[in-house]
Structures are given as C-alpha cells and as structure tokens.
Amino acid sequence: MKGGTMVENAQYLDASASAPGSTTPLETAWIRVREKLKSEVGEVEYRTWLRQIVLGPLEEDELTLYLPTRFLRDWVRSQYEERLQTLWRTEREDIKGVELQVKRGLPEVSMGDAEDGEDGSGEGHELATQAAAPESRSDLAVPLDPRFTFDTFIVGKPNEFAYACARRVAEKPSSPGFNPLFLYGGVGLGKTHLMHAIGTELTRTGKVSVAYMSAEKFMYRFIAAIRSQSTMEFKEQLRSVDVLMIDDLQFLIGKDNTQEEFFHTFNALVDAGRQIIVSADKSPSDLSGLEDRLRTRLGCGMVADIHATTFELRISILEAKAKASGTHVPSKVLEYLAHKITTNVRELEGALNRLIAHADLVGRPVTLDTTQDVLKDMLKAHDRRVTIEEIQRKVSEHWNIRLTDMSSARRARAVARPRQVAMYLAKQLTSRSLPEIGRKFGNRDHTTVMHAVNRVTELMDQDTSFAEDVELLRRMLEG
C-alpha cells in the first residue's frame, strides 16, 4: 500500500524476456505493448533503444517504466514517450500516465558510449553482440527542409553578414577563408534556416552530396555505430560527403568521446577539401567545455554572428509571412507583434501562423483585440512595472525618431507629438508625479506635462488613427 492506495504488481518484468507461465494482467498488457512497439518501429530499432525497458509498479493511475541509464531514459523519453503513453492508455483505461525513471542495477545491454558519467554507464562499455544494423547514408543525415531557402530568408542588418557568407559557401564551397563556416547566435534567429538554404542550393545540381544533422543526432548515430560494431562504416559515410553541416554544436559540450570523433571527422573532411558548416549559440572561443584543439579548428575559417533582430527586421519578416499566407493582417497588428516578441523569430512566426489559422477557421478578420485574445498565453503580462525609459524607447521606435529627442528642445511636430504621447503614457501607466515625469523629459515643468496629457486626450477624441496608435502603444507596454 502507498498512501492508502493499492500498488499493483511491483515485480519487474524484463522487456526482453518472454512471458512467464503465469503473468499478472499488468504483465500481460506490457507484453502486448512491447509487441505493438516492435511492429511499429522494427526489430532493429526496438533492440537498439527499447529492449531494455523494465516494467515497474502501477501506483494509482500512473505506471512506472525503468531504464538502466539516464542516457537511455532521456532518449526514450524524447523519441518514444508519447507513443508509450498512447499504447498503455489503449491497453488499460485505468492508466492515465507513464513515468520513465532510471533504476540502477538493472541488466544493461551494452550502452557503449553513453556520454554520461552520472548514470553509471560511463564511456567504453563492452559492445553489444546483438545490435542495430549499420545505417545507410540516407538514414545518417536529416532531410533538408524545402521551406528554408535563400529566397525565404529575410535579410536585415543583424543577419546580412551571415547571409552573405552562406551565399558565398553555397556558390563556392571550400573557398579559402570560408572553411569551416561557423554561424552563431541566439535561438530562433535563422542559423538553421541558412544551413538548410546552403544545402538546398548545393544539391540542386545533383553533383554535390550534403549531410545535415544536429550535433545531438551525430552523437546518437555515433553511439549506435559503436553498439553495432560498425564505426568504420559510420566514419566512411560521413567522410564521403562533399558538405557536412552540424547544427547546435554546443550539445557536444562535455561529450568527450563524441568530440573526439567529430574532431577527426572535421580534420579528414577539411584535409580532403570538403566543406564543413557548423552552428552554435556562441562563438568558438566562448564554447567552454569544448576541447581547445576543436575550438581552435572551428575558429580558423569564417565566423559569422547573427545578431538579435531589430524592430524593422521583425516587421519585414512578418510582412513577408503575412503576404505569403494570403490573409490580410493589419499593419498595427504586425507592429504589435514586432514590439512584443523580440528575441525569437521562430516564436514570432509561430504567433503569426496561429493568428492566421484562427482567422481562417472562425471566419473573422485579424484585429488587435483578437490578437490579444488568441495569443494571450504568449503575450501574458509579466509581473513588472512599466518605466518611463521603456515608454520613451517604444514611442521613439514607433514614430522613428531618436531617443534623445524625448529630452531635447526640438519643437517640430514630428518630434513634439511623439514626446507628448510619451508623457501621456507615462502619466497613465506609471505612478510618477507630473514633476518627476517632466524631469525625465529634459527637466520640463509639470505644467508642460499636464498640457501634453490634455492635448493627447483631445487628439484621441478627434483623430481615430492617432487614437489607434496610442492604444497600440499602451497595449504593448502593458503586456
């Protein structure tokens, strides 16, 4: 009993064993789940990754399955957990969830290079005698995404250098000074897009062989080759390509054996005049945890940084996506999204896609109100205070004036009107007094601030377009 709840069958059943003479209902269901898994993924994949799962207890409505190492647990969780959940719920209505856990001391079918010192598997265990068959080259790499081309990549100041470098490599692979090409920047800024674009461009003629994969997949393929005693075939497959692209290299930090293999693959390809393209979240010199010799080699070619997007670039990306969709999205909605989602282009595009899908499904146009409603989970307000500095920055961006104009003595309407709006929003959205607000705007008198507030209020009543601009800014600042 646990907490007054019956625990069903805590006896463990090895996933590779046949059913004993007398089995419990849970064990019988597990046998059926295993057989379905095996038929879905194939014998080779089943023996490679799923054979070592061990049945654990069913407590309340949650079933526990055990694996011998953390590496195996993480891999099964990322690749098969959803399917395991579905199969178990189909077999047993009383099972609502499946939890994968590591249990030390279970029989381990040779994990080889598990790349994880914490799970007890270490690196260099005895290789399995029953293991996966070697993979063909088509299985080794990931297919290129046809959506990611140079034509669909929106260029702006933050990414123009990386784009130019990618273009050069696509036109003349292995050019002096461009091998390797190392692209780095934050998540969702376009590194993967550029890599796929290079690959797509190079493979159009059919004369260049390209292999693209994530660093994580490189490691898993390497481990599978060790376990299947086919490392030579793995090496030959990778070293026979004309262009090798490895995405998210930072994944190899701390994976010493895989780093070693990648280093030798890197040298073999470059020495043979083949092109290497790598991406990471940091520059080679900042990837602490990678071997020094590998960092040095990565930095000896062309290193291109993709900077965070600007407001103008985000607008361009959204406009292009909206146009391609065929759905009308008001410019004020695009501006709102560009102001709100500033760090991740992937998330920005995802937000727009969700809006467009919603408009298509419900048959209603996209508006600011529907945008806030549909995307409330993405745009929910953070627990923070709006500052006058933030208001000044947002208003300056919106009307394309210099931030210094907020505190300058310039009286031209193109400057004075945005300054008045910023004062109005400072009064509405902060707890600062009028004199405090005035000091933030070039030491202006409190009466000047009051005049600005009254003037903006009047204009909002008279000019619908102006009122919409102010309302857009208020919504962006409030969250």
From Swiss-Prot:
Notes on the domains: Domain I is involved in oligomerization and binding regulators, domain II is flexibile and of varying length in different bacteria, domain III forms the AAA+ region, while domain IV binds dsDNA.
Provide the family line: Belongs to the DnaA family.
| A single Gene Ontology CC term | plasma membrane
Q: What does this protein do?
A: Plays an essential role in the initiation and regulation of chromosomal replication. ATP-DnaA binds to the origin of replication (oriC) to initiate formation of the DNA replication initiation complex once per cell cycle. Binds the DnaA box (a 9 base pair repeat at the origin) and separates the double-stranded (ds)DNA. Forms a right-handed helical filament on oriC DNA; dsDNA binds to the exterior of the filament while single-stranded (ss)DNA is stabiized in the filament's interior.
Q: Which region ranges are annotated with the description Domain I, interacts with DnaA modulators?
A: 1-94
Gene Ontology terms for molecular function? ATP binding; ATP hydrolysis activity; DNA replication origin binding; lipid binding
Region Domain IV, binds dsDNA: what ranges? 360-479
- Where does the protein principally reside? cytoplasm
Instruction: Give the residues the record marks as binding ATP.
Output: 188, 190-192
Q: How does it assemble?
A: Oligomerizes as a right-handed, spiral filament on DNA at oriC.
Where is region (Domain II) located?
94-142
What name does this protein carry?
Chromosomal replication initiator protein DnaA
Q: Where is this region: Domain III, AAA+ region?
A: 143-359
Q: Report if keyword DNA-binding is assigned.
A: yes
Metal-binding found in the keyword field: no
Coding gene? Answer: dnaA
Task: State the organism of origin.
Answer: Gluconobacter oxydans (strain 621H)
